[in-house]
């Protein structure tokens, strides 16, 4: 902005373009995401994520994740990962490949703010409402899970990390297991940090942690939507 103002004093003819560029730089991030546009693009998402209790059968039967209330930055990064093949799920990859970067940003903005009409969101305490057993507490400490996902697992240190408190236990378990998979073109997630963490645990331990995290209150929810709008 300082450069633009100096330009204005030196040459009035250059002032307008310079100021326009400066303002565009300041407002570009805000306009990159359009929640209203995302709502209009969500038709392909509703069939799974807009139905309470909807289950997917690949790679095993589990509830699809709740995404309403999730961090926009994380949703967008997840869609990009499916598109690039870093996350391997045939259905999600096909959907992601059909989306532009703008589509992903709009959908992410929509789902981050998506809530049930007329219902105010409850404030989630900064400390876990339910304390884990000694065994589960030791497992969580071993992986330093709270250092990224937050002490209450609902307030991660960065929007690129997911809120996981209250997420479906069976989904969390399947998602965690997927980081153990290597060399499979249809199943698995490429994330070096998560892969290193998850490989420390047995499947029984992953299930125990998933059940505890799912028992916690959080912002995630399923907002039922009609396919016909």
Predicted regions and their residues:
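N-terminal secretory signal peptides that target proteins for export/translocation
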Residues: 1-12
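Bacterial N-terminal signal peptides
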Residues: 15-25
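Sec/Tat signal peptide C-region and signal peptidase I cleavage site
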Residues: 28-32
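Sequence/structural segment immediately N-terminal to covalent heme-attachment motifs in c-type
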Residues: 33-55, 125-153, 225-229
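Acidic (E/D-rich), amphipathic helical modules within compact regulatory domains
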Residues: 35, 61-66, 72, 76-122, ...
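Gly/Gly-Pro-rich "capping" loops immediately C-terminal to redox-active cysteine motifs
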Residues: 39, 53-82, 93-98, 138, ...
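Intrinsic, low-complexity N-terminal interaction/targeting segments
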Residues: 43-46, 106, 115, 120-123, ...
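C-terminal capping alpha-helices of c-type cytochrome domains
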Residues: 97-122, 197-225
